[in-house]
Regions:
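A structural "domain/chain start" motif
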Residues: 1-60, 168-178
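Generic short beta-strand segments
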Residues: 26-32, 92-99, 134-136
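Short acidic, glycine/proline-rich loop/turn micro-motifs
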Residues: 35-41, 101-104, 142-146
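Short secondary-structure boundary motifs at beta->alpha junctions and helix caps
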Residues: 43-52, 121-173
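Surface-exposed short loop/turn segments
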Residues: 1-2, 75-128, 139
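Structured segments of extracytoplasmic/periplasmic soluble domains
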Residues: 30, 60-71, 96, 159, ...
Length: 178
């Protein structure tokens, strides 16, 4: 089992000032039965995370946008009030997994992959903009612990959130609050 929730590394960043410019809705995610997010091929068992990837990834993307100076708020997928915000970010998680396998000898490799498609919509945009971001992480050790699984998944999820925010900023879909 993968313990805990996904989180951003602690940073000393003041929240963006002003009215929210972006709302980040929960991302869609087709969850596997019983929270399975991967496989331990060495011990022939599933890897389970009881978290909610769609909400966790939306939290991470909103967090990165906030760290970048964008006044962003989080709402559920069907939350009311999103119409009043200039840009709505939504999307779907295409891949969210962590697997382990022995690579010969004493080494065990833990690999995590996250793929996210973000869609930006709003009255100020010429039309919906869609970007897909994927990242993978690989860790090697003598044995794997639940914390190793979490670290691989958290590192990969944060890298995807950072890249998604970077692409939104570069495309000038969102911008830091002044």
């Amino acid at each position: 089992n993968v313990p805990g929730d996904l989180a951003r590394p602690a940073r000393a960043v003041a929240p963006a000032a002003g009215a929210p410019r972006v709302v980040v809705a929960d991302f869609s995610y087709a969850a596997a039965p019983d929270g399975v997010v991967g496989r331990d091929f060495d011990r022939v068992r599933p890897i389970v995370w009881k978290g909610e990837p769609g909400k966790a990834m939306a939290d991470l993307v909103a967090g990165v946008l906030g760290e970048s100076g964008v006044a962003a708020v989080r709402l559920g997928a069907d939350a009311l009030g999103a119409e009043a915000v200039p840009v709505r970010i939504s999307g779907g998680i295409r891949r969210f997994e962590v697997n382990t396998r022995r690579t010969g000898g004493l080494s065990v490799v833990t690999e995590a992959t996250v793929s996210l498609t973000v869609t930006a919509e709003g009255p100020g945009l010429s039309g919906p903009m869609e970007k897909t971001v994927t990242s993978s992480t690989s860790l090697s050790d003598l044995f794997v612990t639940p914390d190793d699984l979490r670290e691989a998944l958290m590192s990969t999820a944060n890298a995807v959130a950072e890249e998604a925010a970077r692409k939104l900023l570069e495309a000038k879909v969102v911008s830091p609050s002044s």
